[in-house]
Amino acid sequence: MEKKESERPVVKNDSVAPTMAKTEQTIDKSRRVCTLSHAMIEMLVKQLGAELSNHNLYRTFANYFSCQGLPKLEEYFILRADEEDNHHNWILWYLNYNDAEFQYPRIEAINVDIPNRAYPFEATVDREIETTESINKIVKQAIQEGDWATEAWLKGNDDEHGKLVLEQIEEESISRTMLKWQMRTLTGKLNRILS
């Protein structure tokens, strides 16, 4: 039997493997030190501070309800504060994992007058909306930069290292639910007083 030439054409690869000279010309050399851009580090550090501020605000509300003799609401706000600390830890981990050198931002004192028992719930909804908007800006920045790793981390679902976008869906939902509950409670009490 006669040997036939292969009917399948041979794929020829004319491309040249990158040389170190080409690599040196094309890479972003700043990534040798840190994979995050300066703008991304600034945004994440700002969010790190915002999470600590949220923590302190919710601890302030916990103290208020403790002094009002409402330990269940105190406990609720302590748990909310703990969540904010967890978010802070996720951001800290990500910054450290990417070798981002930074200084902690200044955290302003919580100077808030609490005029009534509904206010902490209203303020919490507003603070969580603000937090969501801030995180969304970080996602947009990551997309604009083509920083797919940071985008994936922000949108991730990892209890240990982070899931900030998903977490904000939950945070806003819980905050709105508790505000509605508080408003129904106050309306019910007012109706009983007026009847």
PLM feature spans:
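Iron-associated oxidoreductase/ferritin-like identity signal
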Residues: M1-S195
